[in-house]
Amino acid sequence: MIYVICYDWASTSGNHTGMRYLYEYIQKSNPELYKMYTFNMGRRFLDKGKRGKQISVFFTALKLAMTYKSGDKFILTEYLHRDSYQILFAKIIRFICPKAPIYAMVHLVPEKLERRYSKAQIKKSSRFVTEIVTLGSSLTCYLNNLGIENVYT
């Protein structure tokens, strides 16, 4: 099973521009292979506050780690987006299932990444995932220049 962890952002909810739409399409085309977990980033999720969001992500990761089977994979669609807590998710999966393949999509521009994380934090976060996937070669080059080698466009 490939577990896709994505977010339904208010700005792209219900239209074809968001990651959720993309992965829903992929899941519908192959439901026996893909299982999607969506965090709704609308008012209810935002009202939970930082701790509430972390708890939601923690228990989802714990549930998936406890049901992990050899051959399962994880795709994180908003890695390094501070509000998604996907670094926490990856840490939990990596701790409980050290051999689980975790693929993380990063699609924020370097300026936004640097506003949220130090370069050392960005580099450290790469250790929790198997591979980082970007949507452009300039972001791949930026991450490579930080010393992160497991990045692919």
Segments from the language model and where they lie:
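Helix N-cap/beta->alpha junction signal
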Residues: D8, E78-L80, L108, G136-S138
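A short, histidine- and acid-enriched strand-loop-helix "catalytic/donor-clamping" loop
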Residues: H81-R82, A100-R116
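A short, active-site helix/loop in glycosyltransferases that binds the activated sugar's phosphate group
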Residues: R115, F128-N150
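Structural alpha-helical scaffold elements that stabilize or flank donor/cofactor-binding regions
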Residues: T67, I122-S125
